[in-house]
Amino acid sequence: MSKKISGGSVVEMQGDEMTRIIWELIKEKLIFPYVELDLHSYDLGIENRDATNDQVTKDAAEAIKKHNVGVKCATITPDEKRVEEFKLKQMWKSPNGTIRNILGGTVFREAIICKNIPRLVSGWVKPIIIGRHAYGDQYRATDFVVPGPGKVEITYTPSDGTQKVTYLVHNFEEGGGVAMGMYNQDKSIEDFAHSSFQMALSKGWPLYLSTKNTILKKYDGRFKDIFQEIYDKQYKSQFEAQKIWYEHRLIDDMVAQAMKSEGGFIWACKNYDGDVQSDSVAQGYGSLGMMTSVLVCPDGKTVEAEAAHGTVTRHYRMYQKGQETSTNPIASIFAWTRGLAHRAKLDNNKELAFFANALEEVSIETIEAGFMTKDLAACIKGLPNVQRSDYLNTFEFMDKLGENLKIKLAQAKL
């Protein structure tokens, strides 16, 4: 390459522990030698979040709103042990949750597939992208133990002072039990629908929404009706032009269909279903280290990409002691490529789009050529059978990727 590609504005968020080390290596070896970015950096490391009373996380989210593209390194969400370890002022909330609450949108998880990494579900040759509606339902419910006989009722009191409406949930006649009231909001469901339709158009894959509307006729029926109405009014012609489709499916039918499919579709899930199915699907593809996570906002313009895994604390402890590590950087690399690909799409920047695609191809081709980290070697051979010659350490693997990227870009004569 004779000159660097002009990349435009990107918000990058640094993270914690081993992924922070890898994040710097990705920039140094794979991004900065080839792409000139207008980079807006925010340090979301746990110490800086504590020093700024978590203001840095909010600032980063506002910057993503402004520039439309964010790439995020994995971060620590502190528990009691972490509060003690870092002497934190308080147990700060998950940065992902804070950013999601500010931006809105839906998180889509997608597997990165290599031919030589075995999958538990061998028929899945293309990714299944799960979009989880991470709002409401059981996660914002009010639940309680019913101590003894009596009625549980739900009452709706209109703000305009008109008559209340009361529904009987259950009449407990013989002893107590448990009860729960949960909700969702039309606006949130509409945003979920728009994000899902935008994602399907962006990938060129069909979209399925799963509910249990045969049982929850009003509750799940609302999800089904809102999706259908938005699809018919705003997206149907675009879907037909791309020869893709949208369908509603019952959750049990959808689970069965997903297992026997070859993949290659978007699956929009309600909150609980998405929580369960995203982990189930991730395991089916073989490795969480090979899973991307992209937050897509309802406008289709604003995107934040990150790895779907944590900060790899165990490897970081080894690294601190000067011991060798073999940490998989692929999901973090794909956070960058998905962010850059979206920047390229917004700016109609063909060179940047080519670069993002080339880096993804190099990552997969390198693994398929037999150069990989220890976790992937373990997927192929089983951990007890892995020898040192089967894998590269963290830094060797990054060097190998850098070497292969250089060759690919030189051949492309960009």
From Swiss-Prot:
Its EC number is 1.1.1.42. It is an enzyme of class 1 (oxidoreductase). Gene3D superfamilies: Isopropylmalate Dehydrogenase (3.40.718.10). The modification Phosphotyrosine is found at Y42. It comes from the Eukaryota. The modification N-acetylserine is found at S2. This is Isocitrate dehydrogenase [NADP] cytoplasmic. It comes from Homo sapiens. The lineage of its organism: Eukaryota, Metazoa, Chordata, Craniata, Vertebrata. The gene is IDH1.
